[in-house]
Amino acid sequence: MRKFAFTLVALTFATAALAQRLPVTASPTHYALWFAPDLEGATFRGRETIDITLANPTTSVTLNAAEIQFGPVTITAAGRTQTARVTLNEKDEMATLTVPQALPKGAATIQITYTGILNDKLRGFYLSKANGRRYAVTQMEATDARRAFPSWDEPAYKASFDVSLMIDTGDTAISNGAQLSDTPGPEAGKHTVVFARTPKMSTYLVALLVGDFACREGSSEGTPIRVCSTPDKRELTGFALEAAIHQIKFYNDYFGIKYPFGKLDIIGIPDFSAGAMENAGAITFREQLLFVDPQRSSVSARKTVATVLSHEIAHQWFGDLVTMKWWDDIWLNEGFATWMESKAVAEWRPDWQVELDAANDTQRAITEDVLTSARPIRTKVETPEQINEVFDGIAYEKTAAVLRMVEAYVGPDAFRKGISSYLSKFAYRNASGEDFWSEMTRVTGQPIDRMIRSLVDQPGVPVLTFEERSCIGNASEIEVTQSRFRLDGDRSATPQTWTFPACFKTNDGKASCQVIDRPQQVVKATPCAPRFANADGRGYYLSDYRPAVAETSRARTRVERLTLVNDEWWMARSASHPIQVFLDLSRGLAYDDAPVILTTLQTRLGFIGSNIVDTSQQPQFQRWIRDTFGPVLAKLGLPGRPSDADDVQGRRAALMVLLGVSGGDADVLRRAREMATQYLADPASVGVSMASEVLQVGALTGDRALYDRYVSKLATLSTQPEEYYRFFNALGWFRDPALMQETLKRSLLPTVRSQDTGVLLRNMLRLPWAREATWAFVKAQWPALTAKLGVFQGIPGIVSGLGNLCTRAQAADVRAFFAKNRVESSERGVQQAIEEIESCALVDARQSPALAEWLSQH
């Protein structure tokens, strides 16, 4: 019933919201925009001239506008200029301009004078602050360009843009186009910066930045590149510039299309709700995802910066050059950029093994996709709230995983040719999913349309079971059954069939692929030998080995071992396999040399310890953790040497967290606290690739004195984003109830940026010792949280964090709370959080009795 009720509500919203799309009566071809921001007054003045084409004669034109105060408006057509009356529709964020005499079909020009606010909600044209200075910056995606200038704020309405900014003397201006001129005036104490006309692009890609910026310059194959920051962080921009230079070259070559927007500016912003934003020619970033300390940064931080930058630069082709027609195809933007991001990084730094990160990221999608409330990749959306919700693991990581799977089957060269042809065909235009897979099918000659459509239009994760029937002539006949994986284990409840390739690999490294397109079918694979059912971990499906296996001989590579761990985890999570099978597998991988595998085990075993192990069985479980993983850490050594290889530090860090949190290892906890104390005095005393974990595990037994030292340290780190967030994120790890409450209250302080409040609370909801207190705090402080964050930034993350609760009573509490405090931008998120909580309670009930018996024997 709940599923039906939710669907009914969602359909009602969508139907009621159809009017929020603009009427198809006019379309813009060019905007000339002039802005005069008042940083001290947190307002701006604007003037714009919009060239439009009218589809038919009309007396009115409707466009988007929100939080805009209109001044005089005129419309000129066929040589006649008329003053327009403005009628606002605040609910739908539209303005209708009406003139006395009908405008003829064809060309017309609108001129608008208006004012707006530089808001504090990190959307549209907004205010950011740092070092006593103010900055005016933008974040337009998805539907907030209308807060900066009246416009056709839908992706299908592409136009060119001329931008001018009149700003305070001494400030810098950045926009999408290259700077053409910078002249004094015309007002006292001001100067006007004029930018080159852009190619045709959607409104959500417009960028405006004003303030005291310092930039580092370079170029790549004729494209000027700058990485810009507040002046105090300029020394942290070198790594991003180096990465961008390589990535532009890589993408020029891969796509066979030269970078399409002339120049590229990359700007770090102190207050920024997204991770980064692909504005054409002017990419904006959250500072911690762009700046790298050349003297002291972890490989993980550098890899993250390079990967996020690669994602945004890929968007200059996927999303900016070719843009989806409507937001239901956002996967054409985000999924493709996610798929591409690792390619450029892998070519530049093969030693980073980013294919492991890509495989690990797929789990974010699977975590969402195993829910019965999961959405298909392509989902009908209408309102800004619904649009906001589809920027999720399904759009990003699931799409990327699907593309990797199909690419592996078709072959990288053929797939690349199809991509290049698609981008060339739709350059500076809009495209749909049908446009993409039709072109890919035409170029490759492979049934990509059948595969992609099957995977894009259905929710859920396929799970395959295998039964080897016979071996004839060195070829195995394998009966393969596909069904939709469900956390409740009932795979017959939602019968579905996908069309996708499954690739099997034997121990000699040879793979054979078959298209799976029926509920049950027999496939042939050579030779007759044990095989791993997801070669190189490239398939977007789960493998249910029957009988269940707890050995790793079938998985030959790191990626395959990671895939095996996660496959077996989901079998245990749904009670399809006894949970002790996963524990046996974990024991077999304790000495694995891949940090990501140990980190995955740490996360999965942490779930078991905090949600499935009975309180009375905690000592036995902790002892098993210590007995299994303690010798591994002892062999690696703790604290180890700061100069140890990154992989060694990564394994040590994962084991330290596992033993400290799930194993209750008193010696590890003591050493971690000593290391944290030493790190405060001398950061060089701890390896940079395990510093975050040292501070976190050190906090577990930390007292008021250590907490105060963490807080004091934060105040000194304004110019070191990576180090700042090491300490900031560690605050939630203090188990002392009084210190936990202090951290929760700190989240609402003015000194904590609004972009960080939601992240802190979401992270604390993930910690078993903090989740109940954090949920109580969220309920008690809901008005203050929504006032600080708004409903588009921060709140969705908090809602997703609630899925870490684990009792039916908590599920009922969450449902009741959001029935009274509805958040339209997180409707699906609330439903998914409730389902996650209920599924956690279910697996606890199903697995805990057998686990208790197993622990008593181990």
Predicted regions and their residues:
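Hydrophobic helix-coil surface modules that form long, contiguous segments used
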Residues: 46, 137-143, 150-310, 339-342, ...
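Solvent-exposed beta-hairpin/edge-strand motifs
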Residues: 58-82, 497-499, 503-505
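Hydrophobic alpha-helical and helix-loop surface patches within well-folded domains
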Residues: 70, 80, 195, 224-483, ...
